[in-house]
Amino acid sequence: MAVCAGRLKCFGNPAVSLRTAASRAYATTTSPDPAIPSSSSASSSSALPKRPQTSFRDKLNAGPSFSDFLSGGNRDDARILDPNEAYALKTALVGPKGKKKEITRLPSWLKTSIPDSNNYKRIKNDLRGLGLHTVCEEARCPNISECWGGSSKSAATATIMLMGDTCTRACRFCSVKTSKTPPPLDPHEPENTAEALSRWGLGYVVLTTVDRDDLIDGGARHFAETVIRIKQKAPNILVECLTGDYAGDLEMVALMAKSGLDVYAHNVETVEALTPHVRDRRANFQTSLRVLKAAKAAVPSLITKTSMMLGLGETEEQMWDALRQLRAANVDVVTFGQYMRPTKRHMPVHEYVRPDVFELWKDRALEMGFLYCASGPLVRSSYKAGEAFIENVLKKRRAESTGPESTNVPNVTPDAIVR
């Protein structure tokens, strides 16, 4: 009891408490001599469980320094890469263990943003409300956010697909649904399409269709009536029509060319040698050339346009041959884009063509006499069509044209079209 009382008296003394606290503080700031074992430290170390060693601290110590984040210097990775290294494709192993296979990653220059703009949502809602389809959605175009978004209404470009969403042909590159007996045409579609476009206030629109080999005229009269309705409701809008080949019926081609459209487009899709392997068996490179020639013959002031995909296995000589034939057919505009496989059911990509190669073919096309060439990995037939034509082709052609043809008044009326 005496001992306990003495200890209580010491702790109750302020002077003793201060000296004790000071000695404890000093003890924590001084390092004990490692040669002298401490019974208290030994007991505490045995009482506390040891943490497992991790390599996190080692990774930090061996990690990048501040100089690694600075450009320049004499480091090997600071040098400028040549195009072969910069555009080198990366691969990855995917699949379960033991069954992994190597795939080629999508190049960085082919990646796009997810569409989320207000203009995109508005156009999509209007399309659904009127029961209209677009090739942008059906063909899974990677540029939909850019084209539908647009910096303004007049800058936005929509590509409306007429005559339903089911095609009678089955090209190996296309993701549009196919059937031998697609649904019948909607008689209200021309009026609904014209109403939607006049409401949106777009400066440029691209109209395209599925192939309808089940119809006698291939749907040309339905297509022409739609153009006429649009020009009646929105005469200032520029209309580009991407048509099929109408099974080689050049009378239907002339009917479309005289409907009041501004640009007549028909895609050859690829070089002549690869056409049987890429397009439907009913499609033919020479037939496509005849379609483009017939459109120009029907309306000489009309702008004609075609598009080709790269990365299908075409050779340089085959490309030269295709361009020479297109120029001989007086085609005004050509576009080049990278083929991208929609699903595993479609033909695989033979090659991801580098952006500098697209630039090379653009320069070559312009040197051959094409009025305009859009060329790039993400370029599609209607990619930024309004911007390109307004600035580079259409205004120039209209300025040079004089007479009634320059006004582009339709030569036929809806009542004159015999169904």
UniProtKB/Swiss-Prot annotation:
Q: Which reaction does it catalyse?
A: [[Fe-S] cluster scaffold protein carrying a second [4Fe-4S](2+) cluster] + N(6)-octanoyl-L-lysyl-[protein] + 2 oxidized [2Fe-2S]-[ferredoxin] + 2 S-adenosyl-L-methionine + 4 H(+) = [[Fe-S] cluster scaffold protein] + N(6)-[(R)-dihydrolipoyl]-L-lysyl-[protein] + 4 Fe(3+) + 2 hydrogen sulfide + 2 5'-deoxyadenosine + 2 L-methionine + 2 reduced [2Fe-2S]-[ferredoxin]
State where [4Fe-4S] cluster 1 binds.
C136, C141, C147, S382
Presence of the UniProt keyword Iron in the record: yes
Which sites bind [4Fe-4S] cluster 2?
Answer: C167, C171, C174
| Segments forming domain Radical SAM core | 150-371
Give the compositionally biased regions (Low complexity): 28-47
Q: Give GO MF terms, alphabetically.
A: 4 iron, 4 sulfur cluster binding; lipoate synthase activity; metal ion binding
Q: What is its EC number?
A: 2.8.1.8
| Record InterPro entries | Aldolase_TIM (IPR013785), Elp3/MiaA/NifB-like_rSAM (IPR006638), LIAS_N (IPR031691), Lipoyl_synth (IPR003698), rSAM (IPR007197)
Q: Where in the cell is it found?
A: Mitochondrion
**Which cofactors are required for activity?**
[4Fe-4S] cluster
Q: Member of which family?
A: Belongs to the radical SAM superfamily. Lipoyl synthase family.
For this entry, the protein name equals: Lipoyl synthase, mitochondrial
Q: Which organism is it from?
A: Coccidioides posadasii (strain C735)
